[in-house]
Amino acid sequence: MASNLTVNVHPGVYMNVVDTHMRRTKSSAKNTGQEKCMGTLMGYYEKGSIQVTNCFAIPFNESNDDLEIDDQFNQQMISALKKTSPNEQPVGWFLTTSDITSSCLIYHDYYVRVITEASARRESPPIVVLTIDTTFSGDMSKRMPVRAYLRSKAGIPGAAGPHCAIFNPLRVELAAFPGELVAMQLIEKALDSRRREATLESGLEQLETSTAQMIEWLERMLHYVEDVNKNGEKPGDAQIGRQLMDIVTASSNNMQPEKLDTLVKNTLRDYVMVSYLAKLTQTQLQVHERLVSA
């Protein structure tokens, strides 16, 4: 069923939408009704889910009951993004609003035509509508309300055709690639800063932080296994047990402890040497730049 689809939205999509909203709000502070932002969602389809990995805003206007969309700009952006990322295709559109309005029907009809023409499928693919309430007018005061919908046509039994359309809500989840997770963890560190800034750590500091996190998680897993096997304080979970077995299987390489210790030391020594050479090169470039500009 189409209503069982899950919409996985990546962090960059939310950042692009919020950035577009802030820019449009500043540029149209004197124009009433111009604070909304609309754009195209890029991504790909998977079994039971839609991955939304990128997006871009398009110029549009809905003042004075006139709905205008810059189709040429939209088509050019879709073509450019498909050249840079061939795996991505238009999968829907977004609108910064608290609820579905009557204008959404016209916008959706436009995107049905655009996405159907750009799709290689014979049938029209599922086209998702993502609404983002940037005014926080919903019940969630600390989280920005985000909803996804899929339009379906409805009609009276025995009628010649459908007479209305229904936007069915879909499940929305936050998904991220490994690189995006690293960036999000770095951004979260700025939440405790007054200036809302996060500094990049050096190579050795990042290695130290990652090692400390790994040790912390290993201690948590060890305590969990001890509580289940020896103390009996926690009931066993088959799913967690399988995940722990997968971790042990993936980490075991049938290597003797002496060889493993030598491999770790050599790898760390190589990493330190590369980091030292990078710092030395950076210092030489800075000195050369000062000598040239002097």
Curated annotation (Swiss-Prot):
Indicate the quaternary assembly. Component of the eukaryotic translation initiation factor 3 (eIF-3) complex.
List keywords of the entry alphabetically. Cytoplasm, Initiation factor, Protein biosynthesis
GO terms under cellular component: eukaryotic 43S preinitiation complex; eukaryotic 48S preinitiation complex; eukaryotic translation initiation factor 3 complex, eIF3m
| InterPro entries per record | eIF3f (IPR027531), EIF3F/CSN6-like_C (IPR024969), JAMM/MPN+_dom (IPR000555), MPN (IPR037518)
What's one GO MF term for it?
metallopeptidase activity
* Gene Ontology process terms (BP): formation of cytoplasmic translation initiation complex; translation; translational initiation
UniProt organism field: Caenorhabditis elegans
Q: Does the keyword Cytoplasm apply?
A: yes
Q: What is this protein called?
A: Eukaryotic translation initiation factor 3 subunit F
Q: Which SMART domains match?
A: JAB_MPN (SM00232)
Which family is annotated?
Belongs to the eIF-3 subunit F family.
Q: What happens when the gene is disrupted?
A: Extended lifespan in adults.
Purpose: Component of the eukaryotic translation initiation factor 3 (eIF-3) complex, which is involved in protein synthesis of a specialized repertoire of mRNAs and, together with other initiation factors, stimulates binding of mRNA and methionyl-tRNAi to the 40S ribosome. The eIF-3 complex specifically targets and initiates translation of a subset of mRNAs involved in cell proliferation.
| Superkingdom of the organism of origin | Eukaryota
Instruction: Name the PROSITE patterns for this protein.
Output: MPN
Ranges where the MPN domain occurs = 7-155
Is the keyword Protein biosynthesis in the record? Answer: yes
User: Where in the cell does this protein reside?
Assistant: Cytoplasm
- Say where the protein is mainly found: cytoplasm
User: From the record, what ranges are coiled-coil?
Assistant: none
The coding gene here is eif-3.F
